[in-house]
């Protein structure tokens, strides 16, 4: 899933806000935004955007598009319905909470 018409400057602001601290503070911030329904944050990979693995095994991966004004969100979970729910919740969190704080 993705957020279309997501300007590159919003993408830069979003990722700067989520990554602009030491690892422990960054992970606490990410957990506060995204991990609540998943029992906590188990790991973070910053190789290509922000890939968060939750304690329950759900994966939420946020990344800006390299060639379009959009934000992409990929999710993995035990089944398609859980992945879709995690994706919708993550995108809603970005729009309702993260951008307002960035």
What are these regions (language model features)?
Residues 1-66, 70-74, 80-102:
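Phosphate-binding and adjacent anionic-ligand microenvironments
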């Amino acid at each position: 899933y993705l957020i279309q018409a997501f300007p590159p400057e919003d993408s830069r602001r979003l990722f700067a806000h989520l990554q602009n601290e030491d690892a422990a503070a960054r992970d606490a911030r990410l957990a506060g935004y995204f991990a609540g329904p998943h029992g906590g944050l188990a790991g973070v990979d910053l190789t290509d955007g922000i890939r968060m693995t939750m304690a329950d095994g759900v994966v939420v991966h946020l990344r800006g598009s390299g060639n379009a004004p959009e934000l992409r969100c990929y999710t993995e979970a035990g089944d398609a319905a859980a992945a879709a729910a995690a994706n919708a919740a993550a995108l809603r969190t970005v729009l309702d909470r993260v951008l307002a704080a960035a």
